[in-house]
Each structure stands twice: as structure tokens, then as C-alpha cells.
Amino acid sequence: MNQYKNFIMQFEDIVGNNNVLIDEPMKKHTSFKVGGPADLLITPTTLEQVKDSIILCRNNSIPYYIIGNGSNLLVRDGGIRGVVIKFLKLGDIKVEGDRVIAQSGAPLTNICNEALKSNLGGLEFACGIPGSVGGAVTMNAGAYNGEISQVIESAKVIDKDGNVFLLNKEQLDLGYRMSAIQKYHYIVLEVTFKLHNSEYDTIKNRIMDLNRRRIEKQPLEYPSAGSTFKRPEGHFAAKLIEDTGLKGESIGGAQVSEKHSGFIINKGGATAGDILNLIEFVQNKVMEKFQVDLHTEVRIIGEENN
């Protein structure tokens, strides 16, 4: 029974009839291609609609979850009770001098392309990261010795009470896969990056080089959520997993990638349960062998199947 159907008309008044989906399978909205239904999924088209939706949820004690591209997200098979607010249609990007300003739902690849067109360097490391900028800032995403903290100037955020304010780089308190946004449960609305002038060909060649390395080393041909585990201090997760003999290990349709042990992939027909069971199996085996605790980098939400 979807207890939030009574609020459909109110959400439609905020975001429009075409932007409210009922009992929507989350496997359509995550890069893992798994996940049960969300009671409601809405796609606001303005920041004001985001604010109004959050206030409606707060005033009626409706649980809500923000997602961008769903590329670092695992939704359990029982789905999500409450409302998913998807930032898909909040992707505006503008360039002002050496700054790039992007709404939270803008894919990192689009932001990189806009920076490239304007001969602005600094974001090359992010060009192959499949997520949206809001999620990237929230977890201080990084790759190839670069991370968001190196290029961000500020972020406009909203809190659970609907207050909108600006956080500068220091206030964002960005660390390894962490931020003040996670700590205080803020939601990113807009991000300003401060980049540097560079040569078009220099930027382009760096992007092409990093993308070539990704294609060579990562199992991009299968659904996944990127690196499954955070890097444990003093170790590399993929090496620990490989040295435990788990490369290629499978449970149901989930597999530790044979190409890169740091990735758990959906080899075909996996459930969220398969992936979660494999994550736990890997964690237990690595702990047994090396006494190292692997923490997931992927965000896990939703209900177990009854």
C-alpha cells in the first residue's frame, strides 16, 4: 500500500503532472540497474520547486531522498518508502570568466565539456566520473590524483527546513569521500568551480588520456556504481580483494569484476540482494585475512524485500 498517494496532487501542483511518477522502479534510475519501486519519484525543474517539495515533505513527515544520476547508489529490492527527488532536470551550466557555475543535477561530463570549450583547466580528472555535480560535491568525488576539493569555490545548499545559503570551500569541510553536506544532511543546489586558463589541446589530451586509462582498467561494459569500497588507510581496496582471492567471485548476478577487483558489477540479472550479499562476503573475507575493515563508497538506501 502506497501511503503517500494522497500527496500526489500536491506534488503535481509543485512540479507539474508530467514530473510525478508513482511506484517507479528504481532500477531505471541507478547505474547498477537494480532496486525496487519508489512510492513517488518527482523531477523538479527549478530550485524553487526543490525547496517547495522539501517543505511539503517536512510538513507532512514524508521521508525523502535526493538522487542525481544514481551512479553511486544501491537501492534495496523492497524499494523506497516516501519520495525520491531526482535532480535530472536541474542541469544548467554557465561560464563566467574562470568560474563554472552548475546546477546540482548537471553531469560532471557536461561541466567538463563546457570548461574545455572555454579553455579552462582543472576538472580533467572528473570527466570520466559518471555522476552529477551535487553527488560529486557531497562525497568529494575524485580520481587520478584529483578531487572536487581542489577546484570548488562554493556551493549553494538547502537544509531540511528549507533554508537556502552559501557555503565557501572552508565551510564545505571536504575530506576523503566526506563533507559538511553529509554531516549536516544539506542538499546541494548549485556549485561554483574556480578553474584556470589553459590551452584547449592540453586539456583535451589530458581528458583523452584519462578516459583511455579508464576504459583499459575499469569494467565499463557492465552496470556498476564505480568503486564499491573506500580506500582503507594504508591500503588499496582492489589489491586487498584480489590478494584475498576474490577476483571473479559471484553471488547470483553480482560479481567482483575480473577486470578491476574494486568494482562489484551486475553481470546480468542481479538483484540488490545479490550485490549486498557479495559486498558483505568480500568485507568478511578481507577482514579475516588482513584485519582491514572495508567501508562502502556506494550509498545504500531503501527497504529489504518482505
Curated annotation (Swiss-Prot):
Gene name of the record: murB
Single biological process term from Gene Ontology: regulation of cell shape
UniProt pathway: Cell wall biogenesis; peptidoglycan biosynthesis
UniProt function note: Cell wall formation.
Active site residues of this protein: R177, S227 (proton donor), E297
InterPro entries the UniProt entry points to: FAD-bd_PCMH, FAD-bd_PCMH-like_sf, FAD-bd_PCMH_sub1, FAD-bd_PCMH_sub2, MurB, MurB_C, MurB_C_sf, Oxid_FAD_bind_N
GO molecular function: FAD binding; UDP-N-acetylmuramate dehydrogenase activity
Descriptive protein name: UDP-N-acetylenolpyruvoylglucosamine reductase
